[in-house]
Amino acid sequence: AADELGFYVATELPFWGEWTPAIADALAPEGEAILRAYGHHPSFVLLSLGNEHRGDRAARAGLVARLRALDPSRLYAQGANNDLETPSLAPHDDCWITARLPAADGTRRYVNVRGAHATPDRADGHLQTGPGGTRTDYRAAIAASPLPVVSHEIGQYATYPRYAEIARHRGVFAAHNLERFRAKAEAAGLRARADDFARASSALAALCYREEIEAALRTPGFGGFELLGLQDFPGQGTALVGLLDVFLESKGAISPAEFRRFCAPHVLLARFDRHTWTAGVTFIADLEFAHYGPADFTPGEVRWSLGEAAGSLPAPAAAHGGLRPLGRLECRLPDTARACRLELTLTHVPSGATNAYPLWVYPAANTPVPPGLVLTRRFDAAAESTLAAGGTVVLCADAARPFPGTPGGGFTPDFWCWSMFKNVPGTLGLAIDATHPALACFPTETHSNWQWFHLAGAAQPVGLDALPAGLRPIIEVIDNPERAQRLGLIFEVRVGPGRLLVCGLDLPALGATHPEARALLSSLLRYAASPAFAPEVPVEPAALVTALHG
């Protein structure tokens, strides 16, 4: 099937762990048998000694030499992501499959060639710590490598369980792990939220997979990328990291046609600084064409549209097998007084490749605090006094004094699963009541999208265990099913005769550099000053002190 469909098959020997001469001797007959049985297939391109090895490097090199002598027509590698945190170039290999490389400056730093969790116990990829936008690539990371570099097991974004699957697991495949997670969700009062959590986390995972793949395609001379898999992995702590479930069925987060916009033989790409913009400024994007199809393309054009603006750029002839620049697009964004979402759409003629990118445009002006409303960063005596007198308080987090017990902020879903790597936030994105009037001036879907990139990264989710079980936040932070904590990012409560709106973001500080933070604060202030602000859940001040200050 791979021969007929044009797949390149990278085969690995069945080993993961510490390498010794005895292991090399045991695996040699397996490798030789693979070459004899499958070596006549044109799809069989690469043979690797296995996955994430440590140990005797000389033994690895010796086995590669032995296998190459038997069949010199293959490409060979001593393993995929060998030596994990401290990888180094292996002699005699034909490519370097890794998540990170030594920096070219001779320091002891390492630089990533995947977007998230290049070291799984540390959130250090550009999807966690980067500037946002779509300009990041890995050309600096691969510059010093004499071999083609292939990024290893990109993605691995955890999603929330879909408990309806439990009934489909029978016999020895009974999903006791999912049953345990379901019981935890029920005990935490989160069972009714499970379907929404599954949809929102899967949608975010699809966004992140797209950026992972496009960053690889944006890198000139890159050797390629490997996804760990498209389906969930039910073992090793339960890693629900697939766009498909364990039955290879879609979770509904992305369609095949949408996936092929950014993962196909030819892909249109746009590089721009950020997804969030101030009204009236000039948007600039550099367009490129990643073309790895079988044939060259004759000259054509790229047609684009953004809101009410549209145009085209000439597209030169494109030889297959590389990344081709197409030119720069410049467009003045609407001078709107109300936040809006736009979509940059691109079409390449004659290939027919299309792609689209969401952008958000926000008013430049700050919204003053309405009269009679108190904006604060602490639930202190002054806030309590205002509420006791029937007043209205909006409380934003203070970046300098995090809420107690908060898992911290993060845009991407958890890596692999929290039960294995626990010194990261471990959350799975946002579940948003997008139609709530508090967000009337802040366009959003029910899941995290790129306008939440900087906000989610700076978030202080509030643990809600001390607050009433009936409290449903306007925006929830989805916790992993192992920890199963109720977490709120924005929620409203009644405190005596007063009204309180809590936001786990330091919006006043974030607004200095991020227009989306200014717009979100404006939307919250407008709502809190309106008659629509009528919280129903009563909370005692002492419970709020516990939740917000420990």
Question: Which functions belong to the PLM regions below?
Answer:
Residues 372-419, 497, 503, 524:
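Short alpha-beta junction capping motif
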